[in-house]
Amino acid sequence: MRKIHINNDDNYATPPDFYEALNKRFNFDFDPCPYCEGEVIDGLSIDWGNSNFINPPYSQKLKEEFVKKGIEEMRKGKVCVFLIPVSTSTKLFHKYIKPNATEIEFIEGRIKFGKLDADGNFYLPLNSKGKTQSGTKDSMVVVFDGRS
């Protein structure tokens, strides 16, 4: 299985409370792009679980590849729940998300993405002024549900 390198600026952890709220509804059994440092397993080259949570790297190319893979997995009868930035003017949204999503939810406010320490504990990094800050983009939850 090939490994890919994720730029640390493109690699943030989902806040646990946000994830758990979605997990209660969808009962996730797989995350093809979990938070980690450095070299990671390429979630694009493997089959996904039956119920998947995906917070992909936000760089355009990787985000688009993960959305396309999510649509493929949906067509196999799986559920893929994405947490991605709102970008409704893009080709990605109009060609892939809008015609295939079974649900789109726009998140009020901005999510405070974080990092994980060596023990796996979530924390919010501080900016140059010593304060935590929200993400720089609005977010949406996009569901591709192939169960029906």
Task: Go through the PLM ranges and name each one.
Residues 1-148:
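Class I S-adenosyl-L-methionine-dependent methyltransferase catalytic core
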